UniProtKB/Swiss-Prot annotation:
SUPFAM superfamilies: Triosephosphate isomerase (TIM) (SSF51351). It comes from the Bacteria. InterPro entries: Aldolase_TIM, TIM_sf, TrioseP_Isoase_bac/euk, Triosephosphate_isomerase, Triosephosphate_isomerase_AS. One of its GO terms (molecular function) is triose-phosphate isomerase activity. The gene is tpiA. The keyword Ribonucleoprotein does not apply. Keywords: Cytoplasm, Gluconeogenesis, Glycolysis, Isomerase. Belongs to the triosephosphate isomerase family. It is an enzyme of class 5 (isomerase). This is Triosephosphate isomerase. It is found in: Cytoplasm. Pfam families: TIM. It comes from Francisella tularensis subsp. novicida (strain U112). Substrate binds at N8, W9, K10, G171, S210, G231, G232.
């Protein structure tokens, strides 16, 4: 299966640094049949990034509102996302859930706004350290996915990318063990298999949580890991390109 390598730039960068970053990422060498690339800049820089990256690199937004156009000051609608030429959308990132109190219902409502568009949704799920240590991992992940799995058709679900990001490993330098990552991805796939086995086999489940060049090969080689959602390491073109290179090599072997 083609690996999907995505960079979440979060609220970082300025016009100068982003131009340098785009220039660096444009130099990445990879087979597009084996690896797909996408980046998520801050919304004010999206048009700049689209114009500065090769067409083969997807560009996405980090968030939208679940409202339609109208009197919602400061928000960005699904229609606007399509209008500016975005390819991807992050939904339900742990920082949105924890800092802005986004609920599973909010995540579903945002997904529902774009599921029948050309945009590829990347739905983020993950547990806290307390959840894992108290044995609630499976319950938490199943709950986060329940509205989506119960209300979307198999055809709609096939458009979704799922990003598993253990909250305790994001930006902390702490990485889940290879066994933890594989077991969790396998569990997520088992939830999808209850809906449709073919869907479970073909859907992309990517890992996010302190993924960087030095651990990319081991993580991306796991059988149920179809790519990565990279945070800090995606702000350095050389390191992001090395992760892309590792993914390309894995798909060549």
């Amino acid at each position: 299966m083609q690996k999907l390598i995505m960079g979440n730039w979060k609220m970082n960068g300025n016009s100068t640094s982003i131009k340098e970053l785009c220039s660096g990422i444009s130099q990445a060498q990879y087979d597009t049949s084996r690896v797909a690339i996408a980046v998520f800049p801050s919304s004010v820089y999206v048009k700049e990034v689209i114009s500065q990256l090769p067409e083969k690199v997807g560009v996405g937004l980090q968030n939208i509102t679940f409202y339609d156009d109208g009197a919602y000051t400061g928000e960005i609608s699904a229609r606007m996302l399509e209008d500016i030429g975005c390819d991807y959308l992050l939904i339900g990132h742990s920082e949105r859930r924890s800092l802005f109190a986004e609920s599973d219902e909010d995540v579903f409502k945002k997904l529902n706004k774009i599921i029948d568009t050309t945009i590829t949704p990347v739905v983020c799920i993950g547990e806290s350290l307390d959840d894992r240590q108290s044995g609630k991992l499976k319950q938490v992940l199943a709950t986060q996915l329940s509205l989506i799995l119960e209300n979307l058709s198999v055809e709609q679900l096939a458009k979704v990318v799922i990003a598993y990001e253990p909250v305790w490993a994001i930006g902390t330098g702490v990485v889940a063990s290879l066994d933890q990552i594989q077991e969790t991805h396998q569990f997520i796939r088992s939830l999808l298999a209850k809906v449709d086995e073919r869907l479970a086999k073909n859907i992309k489940i990517v890992y996010g949580g302190s993924l960087k060049a030095e651990n990319a090969k081991d993580i991306l080689s796991l059988p149920d890991v179809d790519g990565g959602l990279i945070g800090g390491a995606s702000l350095k073109a050389a390191e992001f390109n090395e992760i892309i290179n590792q993914a390309n090599k894995i798909c060549t072997e």
